[in-house]
Amino acid sequence: MGNELQHRTVLLDEAVDSLVTRPDGIYVDGTFGRGGHSRAVLARLAPGGRLIAFDKDPRAIETAQRIEDARFSIVHDSFASMRDALAARGVEKVSGVLLDLGVSSPQVDDPARGFSFRADGPLDMRMDPTRGESAAEWLARASVQELTEVIRDYGEERFAFQIAKALVARRAESDRLGPLDTTGELAQIVGHVVKTREKGKDPATRTFQAIRIHVNQELADLQVVLDAALSLLEQGGRLVVISFHSLEDRIVKRFMQAHASAPAVDRRLPIRAVDLPSPPLKIISRQFPSEAEVAANPRARSAVMRIAERVTP
C-alpha cells in the first residue's frame, strides 16, 4: 500500500479530459500501473460505459483486482496484445485508448525489481518478473556488438562501446567474482567508464534505460499497440499517449504525423487531392506538465502527452 500512495499519476486530469469524449463509450487504459488514470476514467463514465485495462506487472494486477466496479476489467498482459485481447472479449471498436509509457514510481522505488541504480538490488528489470529473460540473464550472454547496439540505440549513450567492453570483461571474471547480478555493481561498472557528468543525471541513467527497454521490448510493443489502437478507434475516438523520453516520444510523434497526413503522390500523375483517401487521424494537441505539477512531482518533468483523434470510420 505504501508504494501505491507514493505513486503520483502524471497529467491525470489533462489525460482523462482529452480521452473521455463519450461517457457511455468503451475505453482502454493500456498501462494500469497503480490505477490513477483508470480510476479517474471510471469516475467520468456513465453506467453503460466500460474500461478495459492492461498491465504486465503482477503487483499492478493485484491492485486492479481490488477495484469493485462492473464496468472495469483487467488483462494481465502487455498492451501489445490489445487487438487479440479485445477481440476475445467481443470488442471491435473503442472510444479511446490511453498509454502512460515507461516505468512506474513503485517499480523504480522497489530495489527488488532491479530498475534503479540508486539502491542495490537483483538485476532484473522485467515489468513481469515471471516471464522472459532478466537483465542479468541477458548480460550474461550478450556479445559486445549486441550490448553496444542496445546501449547506443536505446540509451543514446555515446560511451556505449566502452561500456559494452567493460561488461564483457567483467563477465570473464565470473568464475572468480561470481555473476554480474546486482544493480549496484552494474552502476559501478558504468560509472567507471562514463567519466563525463550530465548535470543532475547519474552516469548509469542511460545504460539502465537501454537495458530496461531491451528486456521488456518496450519500443517494439509501442509500435504494435499504436497500430492496434488506430484500427480499434471508432470515428471520434481519441488516442492519448504520455511518454517520458525522446525515443518513445519520437515514435508516437511520427506515428501520429504519418496518419494525419495525406499520402504523398507524384505530382506528375493525374490525381486530384480530393480523390485521395482522407488520413485517419487528426492531431489534437501536445501538452506538458504544469510548473506546479513538476514542483510537486519532479518525475513529471520529462513527460510529453500527445493526443490524436480518429476522423474516418
Curated annotation (Swiss-Prot):
Biological processes, Gene Ontology terms: rRNA base methylation
Subcellular location: Cytoplasm
Reaction it catalyzes: cytidine(1402) in 16S rRNA + S-adenosyl-L-methionine = N(4)-methylcytidine(1402) in 16S rRNA + S-adenosyl-L-homocysteine + H(+)
UniProt keywords, alphabetically: Cytoplasm, Methyltransferase, rRNA processing, S-adenosyl-L-methionine, Transferase
Binding site for S-adenosyl-L-methionine: 35-37, 55, 79, 100, 107
SUPFAM superfamilies for the chain: Putative methyltransferase TM0872, insert domain (SSF81799), S-adenosyl-L-methionine-dependent methyltransferases (SSF53335)
Record bears the keyword Cytoplasm: yes
Signal peptide positions on this chain: none
Designated name of the protein: Ribosomal RNA small subunit methyltransferase H
Native species: Burkholderia vietnamiensis (strain G4 / LMG 22486) (Burkholderia cepacia (strain R1808))
Lineage: Bacteria, Pseudomonadati, Pseudomonadota, Betaproteobacteria, Burkholderiales
Name of the gene encoding the protein in the UniProt record: rsmH
